[in-house]
């Protein structure tokens, strides 16, 4: 893998890409898996509802796409209020990665990925709204409902749009904060005597 990274870096240098880029194996695996998911969305859902559904715990072995992120301290540092604010996007990503999930699995996934305790009273209305909006399909089984992505491209575009807005906001806020720090250090407040 190191040879591939070195080859990629040298190709970037030869192409005149002027950037200090660092690669890590989990980042590349996640990016490659995401690219494969976006290119081949046919496996994300099926047209026929399943006849039998078995709970599958979210593990690194079962879902290599999220392996680098499971039990990650940075993700566990995200506040429950932020998770609740963006629960639609979180649910769409988790259901897309899984290819389908029931509510119990999604609650466990959110807890495992983010350390957040989202209540069923918060999550289930959002699943219904996503289904009503045509982003999810819901199959009713004997003891549970299974949610699948109805239109993978629409789901990806929705999440991508929200993520872009969040990144733009975060970069803008961080830039303003950096300017404030620079201005304060350049113009110290007079001390009271």
UniProtKB/Swiss-Prot annotation:
Annotated GO CC locations: cytoplasm
Q: Which cysteines are joined by disulfide bonds?
A: none
- What is reported on the regulation of this protein's activity? Degraded once GvpD is translated; degradation requires 'Arg-494' of GvpD; tested in transgenic H.volcanii. Fusion of green fluorescent protein to its C-terminus partially protects it from degradation.
- Per the UniProt record, one Pfam family is PadR
The entry's localization annotation reads:
Cytoplasm
Q: Which GO terms describe its molecular function?
A: DNA binding
| Keywords recorded for this protein, A-Z | Activator, Cytoplasm, DNA-binding, Plasmid, Transcription, Transcription regulation
Source superkingdom: Archaea
Please list where the region (Leucine-zipper) is annotated: 153-184
Q: What induces it?
A: In PHH4 (a deletion of the p-vac locus) detected starting late in exponential growth, increasing in level by stationary phase and remaining at that level (at protein level). Transcribed in all growth phases, maximal expression in mid-stationary phase. An unstable 6kb transcript able to cover gvpD-gvpE-gvpF-gvpG-gvpH-gvpI-gvpJ-gvpK-gvpL-gvpM is detected, as well as smaller transcripts. Not translated in strain PHH1, which has an intact p-vac locus. Gas vesicles appear earlier when grown in static culture, possibly due to O(2)-limitation.
Main localization (coarse) = cytoplasm
UniProt keyword Transcription present: yes
Checking InterPro entries in the record gives:
ArsR-like_HTH, Tscrpt_reg_PadR_N, WH-like_DNA-bd_sf, WH_DNA-bd_sf
Give the recorded effect for residue 159 to D. Answer: No longer activates transcription, does form probable dimer
Protein residues bound to DNA: 143-148
| Other observations noted | Encoded in a 14-gene locus called c-vac which produces cylindrical gas vesicles only in the stationary growth phase. In Schmidt et al., GvpD comes from H.mediterranei while GvpE is from the c-locus of H.salinarum.
Q: What does the subunit comment say?
A: Homodimer. Interacts with endogenous GvpD, also with GvpD from H.mediterranei.
Q: What does this protein do?
A: Plays a regulatory role in gas vesicle synthesis, required to activate transcription of the c-gvpA operon. Gas vesicles are hollow, gas filled proteinaceous nanostructures found in several microbial planktonic microorganisms. They allow positioning of halobacteria at the optimal depth for growth in the poorly aerated, shallow brine pools of their habitat.
Annotated protein name in UniProt? Transcriptional activator GvpE2
- Source organism per UniProt: Halobacterium salinarum (strain ATCC 700922 / JCM 11081 / NRC-1) (Halobacterium halobium)
């Amino acid at each position: 893998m190191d040879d591939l990274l070195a080859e990629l870096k040298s190709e970037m240098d030869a192409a005149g890409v002027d950037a200090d880029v660092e690669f890590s194996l989990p980042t590349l695996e996640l990016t490659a898996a995401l690219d494969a998911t976006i290119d081949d969305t046919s496996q994300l859902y099926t047209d026929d509802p399943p006849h039998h559904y078995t709970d599958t715990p979210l593990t690194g072995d079962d879902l290599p796409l999220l392996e680098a992120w499971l039990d990650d301290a940075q993700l566990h540092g995200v506040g429950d209020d932020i998770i609740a604010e963006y629960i639609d996007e979180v649910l769409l990503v988790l259901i897309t990665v899984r290819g389908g999930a029931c509510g119990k699995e999604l609650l466990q996934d959110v807890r495992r990925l983010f350390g957040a305790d989202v209540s069923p009273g918060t999550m289930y209305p959002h699943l219904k709204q996503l289904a009503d909006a045509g982003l999810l399909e819901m199959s009713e089984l004997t003891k549970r409902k299974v949610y699948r992505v109805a239109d993978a491209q629409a789901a990806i575009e929705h999440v991508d749009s929200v993520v872009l807005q969040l990144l733009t906001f975060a970069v803008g806020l961080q830039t303003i904060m950096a300017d404030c720090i620079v201005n304060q250090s350049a113009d110290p407040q007079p001390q009271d005597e």
